[in-house]
Amino acid sequence: MKSETDKEQLILKAAEEEFLEKGYNGAKTTSIAQKAGVTHAMLHYYYRTKEKLFELVFRNKVRLIADSLKYILDENNNFEDAIANFIHVHFEFLKKNPRLVNFVYNEVYSNKENLDILHRSIFPIIQEVLNKLNSLIETEVKKETIKPVNPLQLILNILSVNIMTFIFYPIMIQYSENKSSAYYKQMLKEREESNIQFILNSIRK
């Protein structure tokens, strides 16, 4: 017999799948209950409303993004290794959570309250990363190994090239003659290496 906690987790997992696939407006609590193997009444008993269930899922996903950025810069590495590791860790996070970017973007765009949640969760961590990155950049500029660069612009460039990969690659694969998972994995590996070199070449002196 499933415990209360098991039932709650099953509902939450089913809700994540439903919201990630269909967004808030397209998701149905009846579908979530069916996926979780519980009654519709039980779903509302544990989570009350669709809004409360969505808010929990959204906060969890935003927290996941925030946590992925916390230790992304290792100041003990040399500069290029630190940047390459930043790109790699972020790329791997997106690879493991391919639907997350579109989900967060769509829900933030459609609801200002979600933007506030995102801002409160992400901004302090982004600021910490920027401070670390600025220190690394200043050191490298003094050593004349890189060009002066705004740390925020560098972060935006990194996030952009990685995120665009996971927005467009699934579409491009549909038009490729080779649609195997092995081919897709190889393409992603090559793209990650390309992103690293693109960013490093853009700041090298």
Predicted regions and their residues:
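Generic hydrophobic, amphipathic alpha-helix propensity
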Residues: 7-16, 32, 57-61, 65, ...
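Helix-turn-helix
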Residues: 10, 18-52, 56-57
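Hydrophobic/aromatic residues within well-ordered alpha-helical segments
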Residues: 50, 57, 61, 65, ...
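Amphipathic alpha-helical linker/stalk segments
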Residues: 57-85, 119, 123, 136-138
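Hydrophobic alpha-helical connector segments
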Residues: 71-102, 130, 151-158, 205
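All-alpha amphipathic helical-bundle segments outside canonical DNA-binding/catalytic cores
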Residues: 81, 120-121, 125, 138-157
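Short secondary-structure transition hinges
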Residues: 91-132, 153, 180-186
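C-terminal peripheral helix-coil segments that are non-catalytic and often amphipathic
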Residues: 92, 127, 131-143, 147, ...
